[in-house]
Amino acid sequence: MFEGRPRDSCLVSTLFTMPSHKETKWSFLVSGKRSFLNNDESDLHFKKMYKLTTDSSEGEDNGSSSDSGTLIPGMNRDDSLSCLIRCSRADYCSIASVNRSLRSLIRSGEIYRLRRLQGTLEHWVYFSCHLNEWEAFDPRSKRWMHLPSMPQNECFRYADKESLAVGTDLLVFGWEVSSYVIYRYSLLTNSWSTAKSMNMPRCLFGSASYGEIAVLAGGCDSSGRILDTAELYNYEDQTWLVLPGMNKRRKMCSGVFMDGKFYVIGGIGVGEENEPKVLTCGEEFDLKTRKWTEIPEMSPPRSNQGNGMSAAAMAPPLVAVVNDQLYAADHAGMAVRRYDKEKRVWNKVGNLPEQAGSMNGWGLAFRACGDRIIVIGGPKAPGEGFIELNSWVPSVTTPEWHLLGKKQSVNFVYNCAVMSC
């Protein structure tokens, strides 16, 4: 029934009329029209930006004429790319099956690099409620995805872990037999591999990502010594760079990026006679001057402070930044607080979702996800067996939480990260 039509044309027509989630914007391409490319200035910027990469990519395929650099039949490469970067990343797996050029564009990560340059990002939530198992959730399509299982290593399986998403990678940090190890999940290959180790391997650190880089600060080494060192991770070449040391040693701290600077907040430091000491200060790292500045009382207050609980029993500060505003979850008081950067004080703005149960803050995820805050957790009661994902778009009003998803699961979140690409 397809005689006389180019092979790729059949595939494209079939793909573009396939049922997909509600955010997909492929349908206009069947007729070749550019219905939503109305911003001429934006398109001109994109064409200038992509011109630098066109020459090297056009000659990479030497197969049939339909595969030799053509992305979408009937459209030039620049217009095809303008359309492709606006599509949901949930569709890229299907799109990659159309022809070799599309597959190369997606599997190489080039399409995600162009999306970053254009500021076209989607924010997916990755979390683990079972040891060595990870799931992803797309807030736009409300779709759940199960990742391949992590490498089976009993020591790593039961060790404390930290996680961080940067670029199209999810990094999971842990302990394996006699040394620290980092496993890397690649969105491009949908597989796990061992990542390059830090210059000073550690655990219990504070971290955050910003575009194509991430900063890790503090933590403790394999002998348990609390560190004041920090490192910068470059996603593009997967390298680690040692940064200047902080003013204070700290572990079990949290990290965020705000106003283009990295902040490490709270944690446990070293007091007199090397005794553990709860830190209420934070530190700001300016990537331009490469200097740390201490900020007093930056760690959010907790409702159960002063009740005799060991500092090590409490989770690191649950913090998130949306639109350069810092928010925190007070798990004991079930409250949400906003940080006033000028007055350097925390103000309560509302409450956490009802089902945001935790064990001294452990098992509850509080993350920035684009222009919203995501809370993942379940009821405190044992045996309930479900978790909820609730979201709130911060504003001047009291938080109004919206249920994004709910599923049967262990109601304890071990690790959580948001991948923006």
Curated annotation (Swiss-Prot):
Query: GO cellular component annotations, sorted alphabetically?
Result: nucleus; peroxisome
Which InterPro entries does its entry note?
F-box/Kelch-repeat, Kelch-typ_b-propeller, Kelch_1
The UniProt keyword set, sorted, is: Kelch repeat, Repeat
Cited Pfam families: Kelch_1
Name the cystine pairs.
Answer: none
Residues covered by the F-box domain: 70-117
Q: Which residue ranges contain the repeat Kelch?
A: 114-167, 169-212, 213-260, 261-312, 320-366
Where are the residues of the annotated region Disordered?
A: 54-73
Q: Which domain of life is it from?
A: Eukaryota
Q: Which SMART domains match?
A: Kelch
Q: What is this protein called?
A: F-box/kelch-repeat protein At1g26930
**Organism name:** Arabidopsis thaliana
